[in-house]
Every structure is written in C-alpha cells, then in structure tokens.
Curated annotation (Swiss-Prot):
This is Proteasomal ubiquitin receptor ADRM1 homolog. The lineage of its organism: Eukaryota, Metazoa, Ecdysozoa, Nematoda, Chromadorea. It is found in: Cytoplasm; Nucleus. It comes from Caenorhabditis elegans. It holds the Pfam family Rpn13_ADRM1_Pru. The gene is rpn-13. Coiled coil: none annotated. May function as a proteasomal ubiquitin receptor. May promote the deubiquitinating activity associated with the 26S proteasome.
Length: 374
C-alpha cells in the first residue's frame, strides 16, 4: 500500500539527526517470580537516532553499528509513544520506548561518554513530540542559470499533480515567497506585501495590475493571472478549510477493533500466513507498530483525497467514492457501512462522531512498565 502513494510522500531522509546515542537492544524474559521480568541485553553494538524526513515525519531508528544496517525504522507521531528509563534497573542504563498500544522497545546505553544520558529522556521526548516544523527555504539562483532554474521550477509548480495536491503542507504565505524567490525578486509580476500571516488570503499579496497585465499572464508562468497559479491558490484555500485530521491508527488501535478481529478470525485467516491460532495472530497484529504505520499511511491517503481512484476500482458506490475523493474519512466510513448493509450502524456512527470508546481497564494483570527487574 505504501508504494501506491510513493510519488506524493517522500521518504528521503533529511541531513543530520535530531538526537542520537549509542545503544544496544534488549528484550524481556520471565523472571524468578510471577511478577518479575528480566531484561536481557543483546551484545550487538548499535546506534539509536531520531531523524525527520522530507515529508516532515519523525523516524525513530536503531542501526547495527557492526553491519551499518538500519534494523528498526519506526514512524512516531506526537504523543504516540513515551521514552523513559526502566524502573528497577540497577545501573539505570536501560530505557524503553513504550507505545500507547502497549508495545515497547528496550535499549541499553553503550556510549562511554559520562553525560550521554544526562537529560536524555527530555531530549528524546522533545524530538518525538515537538519536531521542527519549518521547511528549507528556497534558494535563489544567480547568474546566467537563474532563468533556466526558474523555468524548470515554474514547470513543476503548474503540473497537474501539484494543482490537485495540497503541496505537501505549504501555506499561501510560503507559496508566495517561493514564487517570488523563483522570479529573482521581480515584484512587478508578483508583489509580496508585508502583512503578517494569519490575515485573509486577499491581503497576502497587493496585486496592482499593470497596463500589460494580460500579456504578462499569458507569457509568464509564475504570474497570478496564470490559470494554473489561480488553481493552486483555490486548492490551498479548500485544503485550509478542512477539518482536523483524524488519526486512523488511533481509531484502529481501539480494543473494539481487536475484538472484531478475533470474532471474525475465520473470515480473515485466508489473508494471513498459515498460523495455528489465527485469532491470536490477528489480535497481536492489530497492536503492532507496523500495523499502526500502515493505518497512518492509509489514513493520510484517504484524508488527502488520493484514495478515491483506488476505491473506485473496487466497485464501490458513488457516495463512498465521492467521500474518498473529498478526503472525508467520517463520510467514507458512514457510506461504506451503509453500502455493506449497515445503514443503522452508519446513522449511529454519524451521531457519535466525537465519542470514543475507552478500552476496559486491565484487571489482575501485571504491567510491564511497573515490572520488577531481576
């Protein structure tokens, strides 16, 4: 599924790491008592690093320093996981990355630097929950290559894919600055006002048409009179009015989903590798970080309107395909439920959009977070 949307979601890594430290992986084993757990360190030398890719997603990675291979590459969303020291560890060098789903990753510090673990929890927490939000500024071309660079960039700005996409999160102010920089600061064609961001879109640019505005609009691909540029701004306005995005991974991590998977294990089993206990396999699968990442990829594609053509190929009804094209995840769920014969359930869902069912509290089960370590 990820390859299906690879053209619009870049995964190229940015230069440098936000946080990094030498650490190996650890695992939990049964201890000497029912409530005891033993942390066993793996001998391989490793490196934990956090990076932000060009699509602004945060990656928590573990690399084998002996082979150079990145073994773990987890996409972490804000407040999706917590990094903390393992309580009860004698030397205080064992840390856990615990997800809200209950899964966890354990690491032991291998760095010999005395202050490596000083404020380590805060540094990692800030990197995961408060990632940088700025994008690299567009650099201006100089000399005789400037016109060629601007024409190349202008061609990409008015391509059909850019007109229909949300431009990777660029707002109107950033787009105006980008176009100005591509023009080399030529304010006659696209003047930029100093009005702070947050004003109406009409106040972002003070466009005083010149006497030859019509000629400029037809000859300059970066003129505001160009229909392609106008279409981009129209799409930006519509994208900024959309509702707050819904995390599909959070919705699917609900205990109700795991229960449904267990109850329909026989129907879902043909889609899984051979297993002696399909119900248990399904229950574990919907709680894994890999499942959450796949759900987030699907949710992103659905809420940005990229899933519409794919849904249409499955013979979905017009209302369901329309919701997918509009990026309306709630409408898509309601229409899909109705199309599958669950009209009453769809009505109930629409009336309870903001209600979230909390999982039942755990009873008489030890929590690994509060474990005693041998």
């Amino acid at each position: 599924m990820a390859a299906m949307f690879s053209n619009t979601r870049s995964v190229a890594s940015s230069s440098g790491h936000i946080v990094e430290f030498k650490a190996g992986r650890s695992r939990l084993e049964a201890g000497s008592g029912d409530t005891m757990r033993k942390v066993v360190a793996e001998p391989k030398k490793g490196l934990v690093f956090i990076k932000q890719s060009n699509d602004m997603l945060i990656h928590f990675c573990w690399k084998d320093r002996e082979t150079g291979a990145v073994v773990d590459d987890l996409i972490i969303f804000p407040d999706d996981a917590e990094f903390k020291a393992v309580p009860g560890c004698p030397d205080g060098k064992v840390y856990m990355l615990k997800f809200k789903s209950g899964d966890m990753k354990l690491f032991w510090i291998q760095d010999s630097t005395p202050d490596v673990d000083k404020d380590l929890v805060k540094k990692v927490t800030d990197a995961l929950n408060k990632p940088p939000t700025s994008r690299p500024a567009a650099s201006r071309s100089a000399g005789s290559n400037a016109n060629t660079d601007r024409q190349s960039a202008g061609g990409s700005l008015i391509s059909s894919s850019d007109m229909n996409a949300p431009l990777g999160g660029i707002d109107q102010g950033q787009l105006m600055s980008l176009i100005q920089s591509l023009q080399g600061g030529n304010s006659d064609t696209l003047p930029i006002s100093s009005v702070p961001r947050g004003e109406d879109a009409s106040s972002e640019a003070d466009c005083e048409p010149s006497t030859n505005a019509a000629e400029e609009g037809s000859s300059n691909p970066l003129s505001l009179n160009n229909p392609a540029i106008q279409q981009i701004f129209n799409n930006l306005g519509r994208s900024q009015k959309k509702e707050v995005a819904v995390s599909l991974a959070t919705a699917l991590s609900n205990e109700t989903v795991a229960e449904v998977a267990r109850n329909h294990a026989e129907e879902l089993a043909p889609h899984l590798p051979t297993s002696d206990d399909p119900a248990r396999e399904l229950s574990e699968t919907v709680r894994t970080p890999q499942f959450r990442q796949a759900a987030d990829t699907l949710g992103h594609a659905l809420q940005t309107g990229q899933l519409g053509p794919v849904v249409a190929q499955f013979g979905m009804d017009e209302a369901t395909v329309g919701s997918a094209n509009q990026g309306d995840i709630r409408g898509f769920a309601a229409n899909l439920t109705k199309a599958e014969g669950g009209e009453d359930a769809a009505k109930t869902q629409n009336s309870d959009d903001d209600a979230t069912r909390e999982p039942e509290p755990k009873r008489n089960r030890p929590d690994n977070e509060d474990m005693d370590v041998d």
